[in-house]
A protein has these predicted regions:
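Hydrophobic ligand-binding cavity/cleft-lining segments
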Residues: 1-46, 170-172
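Short beta-strand micro-motifs in enzyme catalytic cores
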Residues: 2, 49-51, 109
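Generic structural detector for well-ordered beta-strands
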Residues: 7-11, 54, 72, 100
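Conserved short hydrophobic interaction patches
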Residues: 23-25, 76, 146, 150
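Hydrophobic-ligand binding "helix-grip"
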Residues: 29-33, 58-112, 116-118
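Short acidic/glycine-enriched loop/turn segments that link adjacent beta-strands
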Residues: 45-47, 92-93
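Short coil-to-beta transition motif at edge beta-strands of beta-rich domains
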Residues: 46-56
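A conserved amphipathic terminal alpha-helix motif
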Residues: 116-172
Length: 172
């Protein structure tokens, strides 16, 4: 079994970061090979949400460099934390992850992420589990940090008051 822990500080309040993780509108296309499709939205706070994710995996797994996971979310505490359980492929694996948002004040949040990963097949577990999980985790860390910081910038820009351009004609 592999364990991955990651923490990153981002420019955004826990509420802003939460709104990005739990966004339920149309998804923006990505060039990173990552997509998240909501299969079931869960209750009003997201408890029971089910999602299908695609992500990059090493090409030597002969899947065209694409992995899949089916994830369900539980233990949801709005603007604070959630847990997910997942089944994924290739390597047919089980994962469990937890995300916690720590308010640092001054509009900043530290995101704590922990995941355990276990390939079902004992031969593939011995040969590939560590390398594959390291590849996926490294990619996720970079993508999450970039996406959250970019998303918070877009949220704040959308909320910023619009200023009217000054008239080119002077009033008498």
């Amino acid at each position: 079994m592999q364990v991955h822990r990651y923490a990153v500080e981002v420019e955004g309040t826990p509420a802003e970061v939460w709104s990005l993780f739990w966004y339920r509108g149309p998804r923006r296309p990505t060039s990173s090979g990552v997509s998240i499709e909501i299969l079931h939205p869960g209750d009003e706070v997201g408890e029971g949400l089910i999602r299908h994710c695609t992500f990059r995996v090493p090409r030597y797994l002969m899947t065209g460099g694409v992995g899949h996971s089916w994830e369900w979310l539980t233990e949801v505490t709005p603007t604070t934390s959630w847990k997910y359980d997942a089944v994924g492929k290739p390597l047919w694996s089980r994962a469990e992850g937890r995300t916690e948002l720590e308010d640092l004040g001054e509009g900043r949040t530290r995101i704590h992420f922990t995941e355990t990963y276990h390939a079902f097949n004992p031969v593939l577990r011995a040969l590939l589990e560590r390398r594959v999980h390291r590849f996926i985790s490294k990619d996720n860390d970079r993508l999450i940090t970039t996406a959250i910081n970019d998303g918070v910038r877009r949220l704040r820009a959308a909320r910023a008051p619009r200023t009217e351009p000054e008239s080119a004609v002077d009033e008498p």
